[in-house]
C-alpha cells in the first residue's frame, strides 16, 4: 500500500516541513482492518523524496512514521513493514515508484511472499504504473484508467469488496 494520500492526508511538498502527526483519511483504519481480516499482510511502499530534497530530515520522517505505525497498532492492526525511497526525484534511483526497487527489497526480506497473491493500492500514477509493471491487481484511488488488472476506486475502503 502507498501511504500519503492513500492511508493518511497528503500535502504540498513544502507543507510537509511542519507536519508532525499523521492525519488518517476517513475510513482508512477500518479498511486496513478489513484487509488484515481477509488474511493479507500489509506492507507500505512510499516515495519520500522530501528527505533527499531537504524539505524534511530523516529524523522527521522516522518520527512521523513511528507515530503512523503506533496509531495503527493502537487500533489492533499490525503493519508487516514500511519501505521507503528517500532519493530526490532527479536521482534516477531504482527504488522510487514506479520502479520496482521497493518491491524487490520487500521480497528479499520476506521471501515467503508470492507476488501473484499481492495487490497495490495508491493515489498516484506511479503507484498504478508499478502495479502494471508487476502484473498484479492494482487499485488506483481516483487515478489511472481501468485496464487489465487496474481497478479505479474512491478510497482505500473500497478495496475490501474486490479482494
Where are these regions (language model features)?
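A short acidic, helix-capping loop that chelates divalent metal ions and anchors anionic groups
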Residues: 15-17, 51-55, 88-93, 147-148
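Substrate-recognition element of Asp-dependent hydrolases with the DxDx(T/V) motif
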Residues: 28, 32-65, 81-88, 131
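Ser/Thr-centric signal marking residues that sit
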Residues: 6, 46, 138
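Asp-based, Mg2+/Mn2+-dependent phosphohydrolase catalytic module
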Residues: 3, 59, 63-80, 90-120, ...
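Active-site neighborhood of HAD-like aspartate-dependent phosphohydrolases
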Residues: 1-43
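Conserved protein kinase catalytic core
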Residues: 8-10, 53, 129, 161
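Histidine-centered beta-alpha loop that forms part of the nucleotide-sugar donor binding/catalytic region
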Residues: 10, 47, 143-144
Amino acid at each position: 500500500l502507498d501511504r500519503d494520500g492513500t492511508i493518511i492526508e497528503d500535502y504540498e511538498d513544502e507543507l510537509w516541513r511542519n507536519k508532525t502527526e499523521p492525519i488518517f483519511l476517513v475510513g482508512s483504519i477500518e479498511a486496513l482492518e478489513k484487509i488484515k481480516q481477509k488474511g493479507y499482510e500489509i506492507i507500505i511502499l512510499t516515495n519520500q523524496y522530501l528527505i533527499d530534497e531537504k524539505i524534511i530530515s530523516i529524523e522527521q520522517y522516522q518520527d512521523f512514521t513511528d507515530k503512523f505505525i503506533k496509531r495503527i497498532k493502537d487500533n489492533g492492526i499490525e503493519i508487516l513493514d514500511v519501505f521507503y525511497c528517500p532519493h530526490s526525484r532527479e536521482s534516477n534511483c531504482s527504488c522510487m515508484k514506479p520502479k520496482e526497487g521497493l518491491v524487490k527489497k520487500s521480497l528479499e526480506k520476506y521471501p515467503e511472499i508470492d507476488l501473484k497473491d499481492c495487490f497495490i493500492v495508491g493515489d498516484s500514477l506511479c503507484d498504478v504504473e508499478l502495479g502494471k509493471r508487476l502484473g498484479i491487481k492494482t487499485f488506483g484511488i481516483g487515478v489511472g484508467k481501468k485496464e487489465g488488472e487496474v481497478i479505479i476506486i474512491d478510497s482505500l475502503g473500497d478495496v475490501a469488496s474486490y479482494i
